[in-house]
Curated annotation (Swiss-Prot):
Residues 1-24 form the signal peptide. PANTHER family: BPTI_KUNITZ INHIBITOR DOMAIN-CONTAINING PROTEIN, KUNITZ-TYPE PROTEASE INHIBITOR-RELATED. Keywords: Disulfide bond, Protease inhibitor, Secreted, Serine protease inhibitor, Signal. It comes from Bungarus candidus (Malayan krait). This is Kunitz-type serine protease inhibitor C. Transmembrane segments: none annotated.
Amino acid sequence: MSSGGLLLLLGLLTLWTELTPVSSKNRPPFCNLLPEPGRCNAIVRAFYYNSRLRKCLEFPYGGCGGNANNFKTIDECQRTCAG
């Protein structure tokens, strides 16, 4: 690769790093999990962080099981994952 190409690549990587939100670098890994309704049959209002859309969304939680990307309130989800 030519020195001009390397310089362009370095510039693009630097720009991408600067534009990536700081919070995503410190976001807990479980925030990237898909919502998991669990194994029970209750329908409980819960929230999960959608890493593709970069926001918290509501989903029907079964009441038990599931994963750590499961919050009782949208505020808790936003503080933990969207911060």
